[in-house]
């Protein structure tokens, strides 16, 4: 491998190094330190600033292409590369509320890119959301929570389904045999959004998620997430 070195201002997890070094072996970062701690030959000082890549967990597209409408992996890859050019290094592709047939097709297409390490995973925004708080989601395709459809979508994602936005107040969203159960058992995380829920339902949903996460082995964290703090 070829060693290369960058010099500039480094924004790290817990500090900023005003004059630092990033050393690479090929495409792998092998060292990050201040210039004063670097034993090798440092490049000329520069006014460049280097930051960690953005981890984007909710993205619908870019570069003239959208994940919800991408019928081929090649079309979806246009959006992936557009964000990568601008500093996003891990990207989760988000679908929107659509028919079951469309969602299944998109899941299979996006799973191809995830298998090729172009995407970090897949997020479904809907279709089990609130008509009252649908925002930009097409109300035509909003349906009641369906655990069987959820399991089918997870299977279509081939292990790359990360989360699904749903409204916790809807019937069969949470509890035994629910969408939340299917998500957690399938390695994905329930996420709230486009919801008209009250605090009682929300607390019940949180309690159920904690209980279910404790019962299964999963790569995900044991907490539900929130897609939107405002529903639209």
Q: Which residues fall in each region the model found?
A:
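N-terminal metal-binding scaffold of metallo-dependent hydrolase/deaminase domains
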Residues: 1-38
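Divalent metal-coordination and catalytic microenvironments
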Residues: 8, 22, 27, 47, ...
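Short amphipathic alpha-helices and their capping/turn segments at secondary-structure boundaries
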Residues: 38-48, 104-117, 203-220
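Divalent metal-dependent hydrolysis catalytic cores, especially in the metallo-beta-lactamase
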Residues: 60-62, 66, 77-106, 118-131, ...
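Active-site mouth loops of central-metabolism enzymes
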Residues: 61-74, 136-144, 168
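Histidine/acidic residue-rich metal-binding segments in metalloenzymes
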Residues: 115, 143-232
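Flexible glycine-/small-residue-enriched beta->alpha junction loops
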Residues: 125-150
């Amino acid at each position: 491998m070829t060693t290369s070195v960058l010099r500039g201002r480094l924004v790290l997890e817990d500090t900023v190094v005003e004059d630092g070094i990033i050393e690479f072996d090929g495409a792998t970062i092998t060292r990050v330190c201040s210039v004063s701690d670097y034993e090798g030959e440092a490049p000329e000082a520069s006014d460049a600033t280097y930051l960690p890549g953005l981890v984007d967990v909710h993205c619908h597209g870019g570069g003239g292409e959208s994940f919800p409408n991408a019928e081929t992996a090649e079309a979806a890859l246009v959006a992936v590369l557009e964000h990568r050019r601008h500093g996003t290094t891990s990207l989760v592709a988000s679908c929107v509320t659509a028919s079951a047939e469309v969602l299944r097709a998109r899941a299979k297409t996006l799973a191809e890119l995830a298998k090729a390490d172009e995407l970090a995973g897949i997020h479904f925004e809907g279709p089990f959301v609130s008509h009252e708080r649908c925002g930009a989601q097409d109300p035509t395709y909003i349906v009641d929570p369906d655990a069987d459809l959820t399991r089918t979508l997870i299977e279509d994602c081939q292990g790359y389904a990360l989360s699904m936005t749903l409204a916790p107040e809807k019937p069969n969203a949470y509890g035994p045999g629910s969408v939340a159960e299917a998500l957690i058992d399938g390695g994905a995380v329930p996420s709230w959004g486009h919801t008209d829920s009250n605090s009682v339902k929300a607390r019940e949903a949180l309690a159920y998620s904690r209980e279910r996460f404790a019962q299964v082995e999963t790569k995900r964290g044991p907490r539900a997430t929130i897609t939107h703090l405002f529903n639209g």
